[in-house]
Each structure stands twice: as C-alpha cells, then as structure tokens.
Amino acid sequence: MRLACALIAALASPAAASEPVPIAVIDYDYLDTSGEPTDQQAQHVARLAEFMRSLRADLGAEGALRVVEIACAAPPCTAGGTPPAVLIARAKQAGARLMLYGQIHKMSTLIEWANSEIVDLEADKLLDSKLFTFRGDTDEAWRRTLAALRQHLGT
C-alpha cells in the first residue's frame, strides 16, 4: 500500500475521510561535509529550492493531502535552524495534522543522502522515517532522489 494512503487511512475519522489531511512541509536542511575545494553553495541552494517546490506541489496534487504553509520568524525555517517545539507549534497553528521535514547531506564528491521524517502532530508520533542514498551532485541526481521519495510517499 502506498505510504500516503496508509497514513491517511490511519488518521482519518469516518466523518473526515473525504477531507484532505493537512501537512506542513518544512524546508529541508542542507549539509555539505565533502570538503570539496569548489564552492557549490549557489547550485545547492537552487537544487534544494527546486526539490522543495516540487515536493510540495506533488504532495498536494492528488487531493489526499493539503500542504499548509507555516509562518517562520526568520530563515532558515528548517528542523536544524528552528527549535522543534517552535516548528510543531507553528505547524499546528497553520492547521497541519502531519509535518514532513528532512535533510540532504553531501558526504563526499559522489555520495549524498536524503532523510525524510513524517510526524503525526496530534498523536506526537513519528509515522515514517526514510533514508535515501544517491550518487552524484547533479540536477539529475537530485531529480532521481525526489522521484524515489515521491514513490515512497505514493505521490
């Protein structure tokens, strides 16, 4: 069963089964510990922005989930840059039932990983944790990773 459908089935009450489940998608953190001499920060910022834009669009596209925006006082509005209690409070204020957050970590010239977590905010419970490893630091490598995350989430 696709993860998104399984999550929604687990969360939905019979009365609200037809309503999309609101999810706050927190910007992912990015960490580069590769030690490469070339400054690639601009490329990484652009890739991460596109990754997040596409992820949010895909999650809301089928109608089972409704992506909600949270208000952040100052960037970065990420799990690494904002205390968890603040993110959770803001997600709840925005009406979210679920919260998705994660990190992309460039470990070496060729190896990166993407970690994604989904939390049920009402039950205060981690529903899903997935680690994807990927090879390469190119637009195509990031697109493949996003495709793998989409498949995992069922979007």
Name what the model sees in each region.
Residues 1-5:
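Bacterial N-terminal signal peptides that target proteins for export
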Residues 6-17:
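Hydrophobic h-region of N-terminal signal peptides that target proteins for export
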Residues 20-31, 35, 39-40, 51-83:
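Short beta-strand->alpha-helix linker/helix-N-cap micro-motif
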Residues 23-27, 81-116:
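A short, hydrophobic beta-strand-centered structural micro-motif
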Residues 37, 41-52, 80, 84, ...:
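Solvent-exposed, acidic/flexible segments
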Residues 48, 52-56, 88, 142-146, ...:
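Extracytoplasmic/secreted envelope proteins and their assembly/folding machinery
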Residues 56-64, 92, 150-154:
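Sec-exported extracytoplasmic/periplasmic mature domains
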Residues 97-138, 142-149:
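Amphipathic beta-strand/beta-sheet edge segments enriched in Tyr/Trp
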